[in-house]
A protein has these predicted regions:
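Conserved SAM-binding loop of SAM-dependent methyltransferases across substrates and taxa
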Residues: 83-96
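Residue-level signal for pocket-adjacent positions within structured domains
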Residues: 13-15, 39-40, 85, 129, ...
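S-adenosylmethionine
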Residues: 96-100, 104-247
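Conserved glycine-centered beta->alpha loop in an early N-terminal alpha/beta scaffold
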Residues: 80
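Class I SAM-dependent transferase core
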Residues: 1-73, 77, 107-124
């Protein structure tokens, strides 16, 4: 018998155009069970969100993909992944993507390796380290098409950390207002799930990093259910690789 929380989760996904196959449904259920088991020993997600894990964690991490989408076979970094969020939900949704889960806390990454193995996510790997240091390493420099971040740091810092890890790609200006949703992400991008005073954060990021192509999107999937995620937005940064390119 399906739990009511999962039934509601799947209904919201379906209404938002996310249709899950049976294997994906099972992976999501297994992931939540593993996350809860590990969370009793290691703080992978906040204790207060455990009660509403399907909405406050999983649904939040799927919400961006009703607004934007990646091309096929992308290499993506989940920066400051914590409990594998948003990287693991994306990996379940998009098994064609190569995803690296990065966190600086070894206890978390050790747990994530076990979770990834148990879920059979063959194209997901886990790394331990700090983004500001790994961006200078041969393994991580210019290695990714996109960087994801969820509630990790101010946008200005995320841009600085992401820039050296992104492969240079010609920027394509997309008219998102006339395009069909979810619109295709082009070029090198930072995808950040954010909340709070975004106006000030966006201004500071543009001034201090020189990146000007920053766009904010609502997450309509979250309006389908009562959550503690009111005011959450998606920020997409398309890197210019002009004077603001990697140094």
């Amino acid at each position: 018998v399906e739990k009511p929380e999962f039934i509601e989760f799947e209904k919201v996904c379906r209404n938002g155009g996310i249709l899950l196959e049976e294997s994906q449904r099972n992976q999501f259920k297994d992931y939540v069970n593993l996350l809860l088991q590990w969370n009793s020993r290691i703080n992978l997600v906040s204790r207060r969100s455990v009660e509403n894990i399907w909405t406050e964690q999983i649904l939040h991490c799927l919400a961006p993909w009703t607004v934007v989408r990646f091309p096929e076979s992308q290499r993506i970094l989940d920066l400051g992944t914590g409990g594998g969020l948003p990287g693991i939900p994306l990996a379940i949704l998009r098994p064609d993507a190569d995803i690296v889960l990065l966190d600086s806390v070894r206890k978390k990454t050790d747990a994530l390796r076990e979770i990834v193995k148990a879920l059979g996510l063959k194209r997901v790997s886990v790394a331990t380290g700090r983004a500001e240091e790994l961006g200078r390493s041969a393994e991580f420099a210019a290695a990714f098409n996109s960087v994801l971040a969820r509630g990790v740091a101010p946008l200005e810092e995320l841009i600085r950390w992401a820039r050296p890890m992104l492969a240079r790609s010609s920027r394509v200006k997309v008219d998102v207002r006339s395009g069909q949703r979810p619109f295709l992400l082009e070029g090198s991008t930072l995808i950040a799930l954010k909340g709070g005073d975004l106006a000030g954060e966006l201004r500071a990021a543009a001034v201090k990093t020189g990146e000007r192509d920053l766009e904010v999107f609502d997450l309509p999937l979250l309006d389908e259910v009562e959550t503690g995620l009111e005011g959450k937005k998606l920020v997409v940064v398309r890197f210019s690789w002009g004077k603001t390119g990697p140094v």
